[in-house]
């Protein structure tokens, strides 16, 4: 995830700012080679709607995303791309840079019939200060976040299926906003929520 020394993205999230966005580089691989899928993502909120936009980036351009001195070259590599324009603007306006790594094990389940419905179970959440996804990770000090907990993430269009609604009622489950980014920032001692 990208962040600055003031933890602006963290505080925008925990303070519930209605308009915000943050950036990350994402991969599901542990090592880097020419075929490693790498994604550039923007996650944000615009009033009552949250969104995530993603684009695949080529291995050869990864350094352009990680090195601020090369960010302006992205405008030529991806001409007319709004995600890139916003990213370059925000890297200079907010002075963001790669700041923290978040890792976890994910089990996704997607409904193949009817309306879009997706469950993911994220466990073994780890975080560390760092800026490069593929450095030798043996020197990084990974910290456990919420040890023993699994995060259930529910995504759907319009409504959840009746069978899942019954599970929620049976176990008296409550909706709760969880940010793996914010948990990681807190666990690493980079930022801390303040109470009003």
Where are these regions (language model features)?
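Phosphate-end processing signature that detects enzymes handling 5′-triphosphorylated RNA
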Residues: 1-196
């Amino acid at each position: 995830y990208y962040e600055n020394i003031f933890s602006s993205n963290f505080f925008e999230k925990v303070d519930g700012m209605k308009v915000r966005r943050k950036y990350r580089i994402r991969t599901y691989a542990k090592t880097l080679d020419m075929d490693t899928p790498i994604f550039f993502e923007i996650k944000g909120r615009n009033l009552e709607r949250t969104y995530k936009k993603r684009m695949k980036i080529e291995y050869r351009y990864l350094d352009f995303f990680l090195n601020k001195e090369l960010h302006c070259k992205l405008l030529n590599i991806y001409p007319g791309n709004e995600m890139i324009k916003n990213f370059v603007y925000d890297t200079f306006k907010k002075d963001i840079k790669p700041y923290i790594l978040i890792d976890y094990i994910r089990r996704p389940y997607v409904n193949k019939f009817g309306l879009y419905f997706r469950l993911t179970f994220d466990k073994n959440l780890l975080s560390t200060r760092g800026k490069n996804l593929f450095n030798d990770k043996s020197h990084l000090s990974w910290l456990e976040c919420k040890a023993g907990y699994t995060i259930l993430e529910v995504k759907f269009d319009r409504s959840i299926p009746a069978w899942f609604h019954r599970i929620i009622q049976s176990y008296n489950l409550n909706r709760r906003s969880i940010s793996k980014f914010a948990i990681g920032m807190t666990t690493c001692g980079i930022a801390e929520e303040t109470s009003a």
